[in-house]
């Protein structure tokens, strides 16, 4: 069962705009008994792997979050949402699963739209380990901007998923 925790990231130290506050307030409204945890430079190790450290130094915080969200859900369990995701109904029904993810469209999974899992599921370790083999800054100085939808989708293709946008149970 997925624990009642909502994780989000806010790197860079800037003030949260009203649109972000509106989304976070929707989480509080529809998930009032959930622990909402903000992760940032003070409680997340941005030096945990080269990809994360390089993305952070380049101020490409969305790419830091792509990896960090996997790490905290793997370690603590719970739900992750980007700060532009507004909740419009309670999420309690999703907690009965060991994990869930959402489709961005019929061809791509998008962890930023929200996903949840019990702590310690092997799939998320595999997903994290994929990033351990990469640098964010390529040898020619360009950025490795492979987003989380492609990484998650490519990995899930090896786990019995059908790219049709349907609700499905993925084999263990």
Regions found by a protein language model. Name each.
Residues 66-78:
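Small-residue hinge/turn detector
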Residues 1-65, 81-172:
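Glycosyltransferase-associated regions of secretory-pathway enzymes
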């Amino acid at each position: 069962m997925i624990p009642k925790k909502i994780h989000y990231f806010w790197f860079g130290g800037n003030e949260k705009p009203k649109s972000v506050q509106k989304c976070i307030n929707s989480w509080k409204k529809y998930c009032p008994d959930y622990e909402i945890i903000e992760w940032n430079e003070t409680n997340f190790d941005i030096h945990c792997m080269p990809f994360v450290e390089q993305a952070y130094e380049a101020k490409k915080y969305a790419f830091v979050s792509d990896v960090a969200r996997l790490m905290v859900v793997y370690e603590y369990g719970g739900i992750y949402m980007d700060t532009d995701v507004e909740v419009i109904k309670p999420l309690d029904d999703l907690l009965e699963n060991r994990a869930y993810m959402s489709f961005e469209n019929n061809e791509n999974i998008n962890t930023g739209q929200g996903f949840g899992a019990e702590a310690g599921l092997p799939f998320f370790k595999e997903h994290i380990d994929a990033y351990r083999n990469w640098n964010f800054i390529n040898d020619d100085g360009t950025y490795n901007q492979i987003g989380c939808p492609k990484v998650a989708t490519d990995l899930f293709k090896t786990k019995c998923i059908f790219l049709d946008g349907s609700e499905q149970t993925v084999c263990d």
